A protein has these predicted regions:
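Extreme N-terminal, non-catalytic leader segments
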Residues: 1-35
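Conserved NTP phosphate-binding and transfer environment spanning the P-loop NTPase/kinase superfamily
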Residues: 2-16, 143-207
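Short loop/turn elements that form and flank the Walker-type P-loop nucleotide-binding site
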Residues: 29-30, 131-133, 152
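Hydrophobic/aromatic beta-strand patches that form the interior of the parallel beta-sheet core
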Residues: 34, 61-63, 138, 155-157, ...
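Glycine-rich phosphate-binding P-loop
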Residues: 34-53
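Post-Walker A helix-loop "phosphate-sensing" segment adjacent to the P-loop in P-loop NTPases
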Residues: 51-62
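Conserved nucleotide-sensing/catalytic segment adjacent to the nucleotide-binding pocket
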Residues: 61-64, 70-122, 136
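Switch II (G3) loop of P-loop NTPases
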Residues: 137-143
């Protein structure tokens, strides 16, 4: 069992190290922002990518779009319809204002990686931080290729998986997102995460 786990970790590391190397080949100088677009497994994938970038000796920062949810009253999020989820779930204005825009400025400009704690239905006290001049920001979560965010990311990874989110509203919103935004077709890279321990790169022209 332990040898199987070690093999899985080695395979996972090789995949993420190769993915990090590709990103650094194209965006190793200056600030860059990478999207991990997915509703299931995106956070874990994003953190693995950050770890691989750091193994390569490159400064990186992780953020989740879920930490930029629109402020809601207790229990309100659970009552959201699929339309609510897609159209009003996330506070993209705050996401840009406190994270994307200052991160791109570089230098000593401070940025914030989380603004709202949905589980507690409260705003998060801003923690302003800085990063190295060549840092890469990895943002994980759903709907990242939607038209309103086009041009935000230098590199987008779209996660393909048969797994579906537990939330019915999110599941239905994903169908609308796929129809409206065509995330698979605008992604820089497509990754099959059917087996999260063995992610596999998929090339659109071979599907």
């Amino acid at each position: 069992m332990s040898s199987d786990l070690s093999l899985d970790r080695a395979v996972t590391h090789r995949f993420f190290d190769a993915q990090a190397a590709e990103i650094l080949h194209n965006y190793g100088r200056g600030r860059a922002i990478v999207a991990v677009d997915g509703a299931v497994g995106a956070t874990g994938f994003g953190r693995e990518l950050v770890a691989a970038l750091e193994r390569a000796g490159h400064a990186s920062v992780f953020a989740s779009i879920d930490d930029f949810a629109q402020p809601t009253a207790p229990g309100e999020a659970a009552r959201q319809t699929s339309s609510d989820y897609y159209e009003r779930r996330y506070d993209y204005a705050t996401f840009r204002r406190v994270l994307v825009d200052p991160f791109r400025l570089g230098g000593s400009a401070g940025f914030v990686v989380a603004a709202f704690d949905e589980s507690a239905s409260r705003a998060i006290e801003p923690v302003w931080r800085t990063a190295a001049a060549d840092a890469i920001l990895v943002v994980a979560g759903p709907f990242l290729a939607r038209p309103e965010l086009r041009g935000t990311f230098n590199y987008t990874i779209f996660l393909e998986t048969p797994a579906r989110p537990r939330s019915v509203a999110l599941d239905e919103a994903l169908d609308r997102y796929t129809a409206d935004a065509g995330p698979r077709f605008v992604a820089t890279a497509i990754v099959d995460t059917t087996d999260p321990d063995r992610p596999r790169r998929v090339f659109a022209d071979s599907c």
